[in-house]
């Protein structure tokens, strides 16, 4: 596995700053789009997150973000076959070396305590083989305790909890748990492998892990049918990054989902980070569409202006002709036998009707022109 290069770190910094960190840290929700776009299995992503989050605060500073990104790239590009159980020395930041050592010590001590509980020496082989199974019943006192842990892990408005936040809260309460225990239990209570779960599966997640911690109970391989039916019910998600939200915002999810794609070339390919400013690209496209519509409206407005000018000229000519005909009638000294007065009146009435029709047509066109001007102004 090649070590970090300076150009990699610069590229990671561009991605990190583009995600708008708060106090130089990113939450799990901010990093979630990158994690999902990697197309890696949830269990792999969870393990990468745990390794990268050295200080266990459910956030990544830049050094931790570099660790997370590098391990994702190496898994995607198949530079490594699996996520290591511990960080390699060359990937550990100097400022966090002590924290890494402390974490290793805590895990090893927790494993030793668990082993001492499970492997109790006894003279009876039958007792050795016996392990207490998980009790699915939750008492009132236990439920109150679990709810307290659950509420401390809530990070979203719909009161659902993510794997990272809930696991961190459970670990702070029960220390004899391994990452494998947490991951296996999460998959058990989350059959649909959603990014977050509701209160009921969260309480059973805590309930199972408490018994694993206190009594070294083996994690069940399946749920009781009643619980499984409850946990697999479709939950309405309010998370904008979820698939349900794609129905409401197809432009964003379709045209911009490639901001972090799986590289096709061998080795660590950082070209996938290009195009992270997809919002700017989308706005530029919308601006180009608006400019096109504005240009079209202006052309229509110009054509209507030309048409109005022609209508004014025709009206003026007809009015002049009408005036000429009236003068002929008024100034004519010939007798009624020699002049067809009735025919002239018919001609005058016909011309007046035509002028009236043209005036109505002109009025209609002026109304259309006025509406077009309003549309043009609204586009600015």
UniProtKB/Swiss-Prot annotation:
Assembly and partners are described as:
Component of the PAN1 actin cytoskeleton-regulatory complex.
> Which compartment or compartments is the protein found in?
Cell membrane; Endosome membrane; Cytoplasm, Cytoskeleton, Actin patch
EF-hand domain location is 40-75
Kindly give the Pfam families that the UniProt entry links to this protein. EH, End3
Q: What is this protein called?
A: Actin cytoskeleton-regulatory complex protein END3
Name a single GO cellular component: plasma membrane
Q: Locations of Polar residues compositional bias?
A: 251-261
Ranges for the region named Disordered are 102-122, 238-271
Coiled-coil segments: 278-379
One GO term (biological process): endosomal transport
Coarsely, its chief localization is membrane
Function (record text): Component of the PAN1 actin cytoskeleton-regulatory complex required for the internalization of endosomes during actin-coupled endocytosis. The complex links the site of endocytosis to the cell membrane-associated actin cytoskeleton. Mediates uptake of external molecules and vacuolar degradation of plasma membrane proteins. Plays a role in the proper organization of the cell membrane-associated actin cytoskeleton and promotes its destabilization.
- What CDD domains does its record include? EH
Q: How does this protein sit in the membrane?
A: Peripheral membrane protein
Give every EH domain span.
8-98, 142-234
Supply the gene name: END3
SMART domains in the record: EH (SM00027)
Alphabetical list of PANTHER family matching this protein: EH DOMAIN
Entry's Gene Ontology molecular function annotations: actin binding; calcium ion binding
**What does the similarity note say?**
Belongs to the END3 family.
């Amino acid at each position: 596995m090649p070590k970090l290069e300076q150009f990699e770190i610069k590229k990671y910094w561009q991605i990190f700053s583009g995600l708008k960190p708060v106090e130089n840290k990113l939450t799990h929700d901010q990093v979630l789009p990158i994690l999902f776009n990697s197309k890696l299995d949830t269990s792999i992503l969870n393990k990468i997150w745990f390794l990268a989050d050295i200080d266990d605060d459910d956030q990544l500073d830049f050094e931790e973000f570099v660790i997370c990104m590098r391990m994702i790239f190496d898994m995607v590009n198949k530079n490594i076959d699996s996520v290591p159980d511990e960080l390699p020395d060359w990937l550990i930041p100097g400022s966090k070396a002590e924290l890494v050592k402390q974490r290793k010590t805590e895990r090893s001590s927790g494993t030793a305590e668990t082993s001492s509980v499970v492997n109790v020496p006894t003279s009876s082989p039958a007792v050795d083989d016996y392990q207490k199974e998980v009790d699915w019943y939750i008492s009132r006192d236990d439920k109150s305790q679990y709810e307290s842990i659950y509420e401390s892990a809530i990070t979203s408005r719909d009161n659902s909890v993510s794997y990272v936040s809930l696991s961190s809260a459970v670990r702070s309460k029960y220390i004899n748990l391994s990452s494998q225990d947490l991951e296996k239990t999460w998959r058990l209570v989350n059959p649909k492998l959603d990014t977050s779960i509701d209160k009921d599966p969260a309480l059973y997640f805590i309930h199972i892990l408490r018994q694993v911690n206190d009594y070294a109970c083996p994690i069940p391989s399946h749920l009781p049918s009643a619980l499984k039916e409850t946990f697999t019910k479709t939950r309405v998600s309010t998370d904008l990054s979820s698939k349900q939200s794609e129905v409401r915002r197809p432009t964003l999810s379709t045209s911009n989902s490639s901001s972090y794609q799986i590289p096709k070339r061998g080795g660590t390919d950082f070209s996938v980070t290009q195009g992270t400013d997809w919002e700017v690209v989308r706005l530029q496209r919308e601006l180009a569409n608006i400019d096109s519509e504005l240009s079209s409206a202006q052309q229509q407005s110009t054509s209507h202006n030309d048409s109005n000018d022609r209508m004014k000229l025709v009206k003026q000519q007809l009015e002049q002709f009408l005036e000429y005909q009236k003068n002929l009638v008024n100034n004519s000294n010939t007798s009624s036998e020699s002049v067809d007065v009735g025919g002239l009146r018919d001609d005058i009435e016909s011309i007046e009707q035509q002028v009236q029709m043209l005036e109505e047509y002109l009025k209609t066109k002026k109304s259309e022109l006025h509406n077009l001007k309003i549309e043009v102004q609204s586009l600015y």
